[in-house]
């Protein structure tokens, strides 16, 4: 299991701690922490701890605000983790991927030395001619080295580097005017022009309410899923929203929102959840009439993952058995 944490604040306000850092999450926040994070006991919000063997997210802690429109999509991702899936969905991992590429460093030693100065301090105002004199080459030679090895002229490369850094700062709540000054643009209008040229968007697209390196937009649709799994101990399956079908040798049941069915320990089961639907495994003994997402989170925080995904050979055998064993469908 990855030691990193991915936390979705479904509702309310919560305090999250990891290492020496403290984050306050509000409804609609998604937090990635490179180490295990803990939700404070006195938090008033509902936080879903989305745990996978592999998150495919790298780098420092980041909090991004998606808004309540992403609630169902992230709740579905939480359900995937409880069903034993090993990897975070690519469309969620991509939310943390930089959408403004860092310009490539030039290969020639003189040009690379200049580029490294600008990486360390994007606001540096040294001109091409001054850099050339420092490096002991002509301005024309330095310009040619940048253009040939990166595809950018010197001024274009500097602007691209500034835009890359600016996008990161904007995603961390710095104002556009402050960011323009920090990365070396004389005015916000200069930053805006550079953004349009290098990203096709304005700086406001990268501010709070959007995602780090670009707008998150509307959440992707919840896909239909099929899971072949085995319960470690007696489990129940609760349909949070939509519909699902549970099939075992000799048994098949179609279920709707709010329904619950028991999966006996050791039973190999096929679970088909319809598109736009969400289902959760929960311990035996819970009453379907009192079930809600808060209870799902509480009980699953106290137990290991309840289901194990079958190996391909196992689910292939189960599929053949289900196909050749006609059973009545229960509604």
Swiss-Prot record:
Q: Which residues form the HTH araC/xylS-type domain?
A: 112-209
What SUPFAM superfamilies does the record tag this protein with?
Homeodomain-like, RmlC-like cupins
List the Pfam families hit by this protein, alphabetically.
HTH_18 (PF12833)
Family annotation (InterPro entries):
Homeodomain-like_sf, HTH_AraC, HTH_AraC-typ_CS, RmlC_Cupin_sf
Question: What does the induction field say?
Answer: Repressed by DtxR under iron excess.
Recorded phenotype for the gene knockout or disruption: Under iron limitation, the ripA deletion mutant shows a 2-fold higher aconitase activity and a higher mRNA level for the acn, catA, leuCD, narKGHJI, sdhCAB and pta genes.
**SMART domains reported for this sequence:** HTH_ARAC (SM00342)
A Gene Ontology annotation in the biological process aspect, one of them, is:
regulation of DNA-templated transcription
Q: Which GO terms describe its molecular function?
A: DNA-binding transcription factor activity; sequence-specific DNA binding
Residue range(s) of DNA binding per entry: 129-150, 176-199
Q: Which UniProt keywords apply?
A: DNA-binding, Repressor, Transcription, Transcription regulation
Superkingdom field: Bacteria
Task: Report the protein's function.
Answer: Under iron limitation, RipA negatively controls the expression of the acn (aconitase), catA (catechol 1,2 dioxygenase), leuCD (isopropylmalate dehydratase), narKGHJI (nitrite/nitrate transporter and nitrate reductase), sdhCAB (succinate dehydrogenase), pta (phosphotransacetylase) and katA (catalase) genes. Binds to the consensus sequence in the promoter region.
Could you tell me what this protein is called?
HTH-type transcriptional regulator RipA
| Organism the protein comes from | Corynebacterium glutamicum (strain ATCC 13032 / DSM 20300 / JCM 1318 / BCRC 11384 / CCUG 27702 / LMG 3730 / NBRC 12168 / NCIMB 10025 / NRRL B-2784 / 534)
Gene name, please?
ripA
